[in-house]
Amino acid sequence: MDRTIVTNATCMSCGCLCDDIDLHTEDGRIVRAERACRLGREWFFGYHGDSQTTALVDGRPASMDEAVEAAASILARADLPLIYGLGNSTCESQRAAIMLAEDIGGVIDTHTSMTHGPSKLGAQLVGKVTCTLGEVRNRADLLIYWGTNPVETHPRHFTRYAYTPRGKFVPGGRYDRTMILVDVQDTLSARAADQFLQIQPGTDFELLTVLRAIVRDQKVDADLLAATGLTLEHATDLVAQMTGARFGVFFFGTGLSRTRGRHMNVAALHSLTMALNAFTKFAAVPMRDLGNDVGADNVMSWLTGYPVGVDFSRGYPRSNPGEFTAVDLLTRREADAALIVAADPWSTMPEAAVEHLETIPHVVIDRAGAGPRANARVQFVTASPGIDAPGTAYRMDWVPVSMRAAFNSRQATDEEVLGRIRHALAAA
């Protein structure tokens, strides 16, 4: 048996983008992923490098050339084609997808619109103060998780970046840090926290507004605070901990950005963060879900000027969340073809959107091991980023990570497939 160890592989199972994973391989298969969490093991053990299938057309195996021609034909005939996904693809592939969207005069949207799209809008409203996870590890002595459950969604966030590691200015690790969780329900993360503040659903904006008023020594609306489920004592104690910290960080999730208030919640959090900087160093970092959601935001912004929901139907980019975002286009039944890249809208989108997606011709580009899509007209089986496909991805703190391939790939990369579709359209 041919056994090898590939060191420092990158895991794209979540926004932590851990790049310290040692892969133990046997005859080209991953048998152990050292230091990987539960989600990471699922990512690596889901790798099927021995897959002989490169493409499917109408559910049957097909050559790459046949599949490319079929995909190009579907997109060329569409009046308003939609390209969606990209959260588990490389920045290079995301760039190719945007160029394809421009070529076909379609709409391109990413997984961000369903998770932290409101976070982008909130930051645009008031600005933001942020930091890297390296700064958190070495400096932060107060961690406030808001509307997120990292124990289950980002299992190594505590141990690798935030709560337990020993840092330059926090040599005692967790003994030099305080971790507070603000959420609407008891979770595994709440049980790990030093302090858990359970608030009423849909009252994040009110609580953030009250906290900022206390920070700025302004009058507090007692009725507003009572609606949150916390007392004035709770709020003043929390503010005292925030202003007394040497370096504090908010980590916020979709429990803040996707609940009542949406982007205004995030704007309120960033406003509170900026107010706290009059007393101490404070920052805010979103807990991003997929491995390269942040990369998709960045590449979309670089090339189009907008992070989500970009429409090229008029020959130039324009964006309007709620109009050109994928869920809305599909729910209104406006898109008449779709290209899904490294995403699973069937398990994440509302039923109405999925129902329409199933009625229109759609092409799927996803890594080996994702499984066949029964109703996909064309499906490409591609290499897995960070496993057998090199490229660049962005961590949740906007730090780029260069990924090398641990194996020689038998499949094409997402970027190569998208490039071939563009070439076929240009030659038609």
What are these regions (language model features)?
Residues 120-279, 305-428:
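Non-catalytic alpha/beta scaffold blocks inside enzyme catalytic domains
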Residues 1-204, 209-213, 334, 421-428:
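N-terminal export/assembly segments and adjacent metallocofactor-ligating motifs
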Residues 83, 272, 288:
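Active-site diphosphate/adenylate-binding microenvironment
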Residues 277, 284-293, 367-369:
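Short, flexible loop segments at boundaries between secondary-structure elements
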Residues 7-20, 258, 287-301:
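N-terminal, charge-rich interaction modules
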Residues 79-82, 108, 280, 284, ...:
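Secondary-structure boundary/capping signal
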